[in-house]
A protein has these predicted regions:
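C-terminal accessory segments enriched in acidic
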Residues: 3-5, 9, 26-56, 156, ...
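Hydrophobic h-region of N-terminal signal peptides that target proteins for export
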Residues: 15-24
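Soluble metallo-hydrolase cores and metallopeptidase-like ectodomains found primarily
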Residues: 59-122
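Generic recognition of flexible, low-complexity loop/linker segments
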Residues: 74-76, 114, 161-163, 262-264, ...
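Short HxH-centered metal-ligating active-site micro-motif
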Residues: 83, 114-142, 178
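Short, glycine-/Ser/Thr-/acidic-enriched flexible segments
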Residues: 93, 180, 355-356
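Short glycine/proline-enriched loop/turn "hinge" motifs that connect secondary-structure elements
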Residues: 115-120, 233-239, 340-344
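Active-site/substrate-binding loop(s) of hydrolase catalytic cores
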Residues: 122, 136-294
Length: 405
């Protein structure tokens, strides 16, 4: 059975289960994997006019990849806790061979080339999204980025020549549209409705909710890892099918298969820059990672590239680029970006997008409005400027040059 025939049967089976309603007319019961969940009926209403460029579900993203990726290659880099394949799209040539030391050893030797090997000067860009299942903006962004690399245009037909130009100058591109396949599969929506300033539905679907429809909330969702799926309530899209939020996995203990897949692929590819796309900001915002101190100044420069351009494009809360200051960037705690940095030496950065389902209030009570087109523009501008940064600064080999040369 080929992929597309299999998809038809899977979709039919899912629709039958998803369509069954429980006795309470305000709750809907559906199954994802081996788990059955009840969610308020109203929370599962989709936007009526979903744009054609908004490709975000596991099924639709997978179909898009197999229909459209011609210049790159699709690789299955691992499987989720629920057994779902994690797909990456890669362009260019991978690093060859290995170094002579561990990453930690190379830091002790004061020459990262000892870890990265003879292709140390290569530049490798890694973009990933969907670490949390209902943070759709980054998924849509990477799908459209793949479209640009393949055709020169996003799925709206808009050309991005500078993305094509920068991508051609990078030795290796790695794009992972959905990291947390389980969390995304748990949410049957392609695109939620917009609820104005009310973020209840987004938080319920993303960070989870209680049986009465109230939200667990952030950061409360991080108090219990793993979550017990046997308890009443809905876990949201944060955890995988083992109940683990892989953004905060047990990195030095028993790692989840998604985390291990990222670790193994990162050790193989040894990227310079990882852009970890999330949702949870008033305006698109880059977070300062908890990482090697030597990369702090590198982050400052990356921040200015991205945030300044977003400001110029009127996608920030200010129209004055001179107001952009990396010292005001939110500071992340120890998380998967820290672990990836200390695992392979990459500068790994969280970027938070606004949500399509609600608009945050800003000063004076006004709403920071973001249309789907604006959200996509911000995603692609972020990737474009991050790529430009990598091209113009030269990557890890130039950020921390070897004193042994």
């Amino acid at each position: 059975m080929n992929y597309f025939t299999q998809k038809k049967y899977q979709t039919f089976f899912f629709v039958l289960i998803f369509g069954s309603l429980c006795l309470n007319a305000q709750m809907r019961t559906y199954q994802s994997g081996n788990f059955t969940f009840k969610v308020p009926e109203a929370y599962l209403r989709e936007r009526k006019d979903i744009p054609s460029f908004w490709i975000s579900t596991v099924e639709d993203v997978t179909e898009f990849l197999y229909r459209n990726v011609k210049k790159g290659e699709i690789e299955i880099i691992g499987h989720s806790a629920g057994g779902r394949p994690i797909r990456a799209v890669v362009y260019g040539n991978a690093r060859q061979g290995k170094g002579t030391s561990t990453f930690s050893g190379s830091l002790g030797f004061r020459d990262v080339k000892a870890y990265r090997g003879r292709n140390h000067d290569m530049t490798v860009y890694w973009g990933m999204a969907g670490v949390h299942g209902f943070e759709l903006e980054g998924i849509v962004g990477i799908v459209n980025l793949i479209s640009v690399i393949e055709t020169g245009k996003d799925l709206r037909g808009k050309a991005w020549p500078e993305i094509s130009e920068q991508a051609a100058k990078i030795d290796r591109l790695i794009l992972i549209p959905i990291v947390n396949q389980d969390g995304r599969a748990r949410l049957p929506l392609r695109m939620g409705k917009n609820y104005g300033s009310d973020n209840t539905v987004h938080e319920y679907l993303n960070t989870g909710g209680n049986p009465d429809g109230t939200i667990i909330g952030w950061p409360q969702i991080k108090e219990f890892i793993p979550l017990d799926f046997g308890k009443p309530g809905f876990p949201g899209g944060y955890p995988n099918d083992a109940g683990v939020n892989i953004q905060h996995d047990d990195f030095f203990g028993k790692r989840q298969p998604e985390t291990q897949a990222l670790f193994d692929f990162a050790a193989l590819e040894r990227p310079d820059l990882i852009m970890n796309m999330h949702t949870g900001a008033v305006y698109m915002t880059m977070h300062r990672p908890f990482c090697e101190p030597v990369l702090s100044a590198v982050f400052d420069s990356l921040y200015m590239y991205v945030q300044k351009r977003l400001t110029i494009e009127n996608l920030q809360g200010t129209t004055k680029p001179e107001n952009i200051n990396p010292q005001r960037a939110p500071r992340d705690a120890y998380n998967i970006d820290t672990a990836l940095n200390l695992h392979c030496g990459a500068l790994s950065v969280v970027v938070e997008s606004p949500s399509h389902t609600f608009d945050n209030k800003i000063s004076g009570g006004a709403l920071a409005l973001h249309t789907p087109d604006m959200l996509l523009d911000a995603q692609l501008i972020c990737h474009r400027e991050a790529m430009r940064f990598l091209v113009e600064t030269g990557g890890r080999s130039k950020w921390t040059p070897s004193p042994n040369r």
